[in-house]
UniProtKB/Swiss-Prot annotation:
Gene3D superfamilies: 3.30.420.40. Catalyzes the formation of acetyl phosphate from acetate and ATP. Can also catalyze the reverse reaction. The active site is at D145. This is Acetate kinase. Keywords: ATP-binding, Cytoplasm, Kinase, Magnesium, Metal-binding, Nucleotide-binding, Transferase. Its EC number is 2.7.2.1. Substrate binds at R88.
Amino acid sequence: MKILVLNSGSSSIKFKFFDNKVVKASGLVEKIGEQNSKVILKNVLNNESFERELMINNHEEGLSIVNELFKESGILADLNALDGCGHRIVHGGRNLSEHCLVDDYVLKEIDRVSIFAPLHNPAHLAGIKTMIKAAPSVANVAIFDTAFHRTMPDFAYMYALPYDFYDKHNIRRYGFHGTSHAFVSSRAASLLEKDKSELNVISAHLGNGASVCAIEKGKSVDTSMGFTPLEGLVMGTRCGDLDPAILPFISHLKGLTIEEIDTLMNKKSGVYGICGYNDFRDIEREIEQGNDKARLALDMFCYRLVKYIGSYFAVLPKTDAIIFTGGIGENDSLVRQKVCERLAHLGIELDFELNKQRISGERMINHANSKVKVLVIPTDEELEIARITEELISN
């Protein structure tokens, strides 16, 4: 099957093209709405690139140029030749709890729950509508970051607020990074030679946004992100868990509006708020140069991560493995070491030499005697989206 995967942002479109589950092309439309917009399509098989630089006013114009580059490259005759298009959608809300084929109801519901993800869902919706217009005969599939967490029990996803806030306004914990957690847990089952239905793992997706997921018998039973991706771990620029009473206090102290506080928590906090850096390579370089705030930021990040992983040991009946994924999880040996050392009493023995090896790909980095395996698994959300898209279209 020929499947296109789209991740539409407010001013960009990232895409990958799969032919029979093999990546044939990837690319990006960037700076939509600006004078110096750019479209890049790369033939993954021979590394040949095709580019356009011109003013792109909207997503529709951007996708039209992507179509031109597909034709020029010879990779795809036309977008209408696709069997399906999978769209990454951050938030499905309460009603769209599973991945699904797009119809009028789905479009309206994605729009309705945009209030939960105002930075993401409107752009995703624009991407879907653009694709429908460009290739009316192609099936579109909505893949929700929240869907993997639909199996959380009510006592895990409810907030201890008056019940009406859930019943009437759908305020609950939804969780995110679901496509990534689903992909790496599936790969872990293969690596550990276990059936997914018997797999108990803790998945840590660590990037600029970060979350942990407790997976019991292959299903999500708890996760660190909540109603929004702000809850949970200390992140690149997000504060994570916070005493809610701090918000009105800050508002009175600094005279900030709700919108300004939201920006403060999402874009000016996390490790960046502590030390001025959100790239962990910069943070670790600063630590080597004696920057105490950088040391504090790293310690806070790792400590919160340890607390969440430790709590999920208590949630799961047993734990087969911890999975590290995402840019930091896959590449930062110091973070993995600091976390695993603090969890040693739970049966985790890291092999320090394996951990330090700078190699890509899936690998096991625990000592042979470790009761709990430690896995590094590069995530591939686009491949997972393509797989689900193909599955739903076939059925």
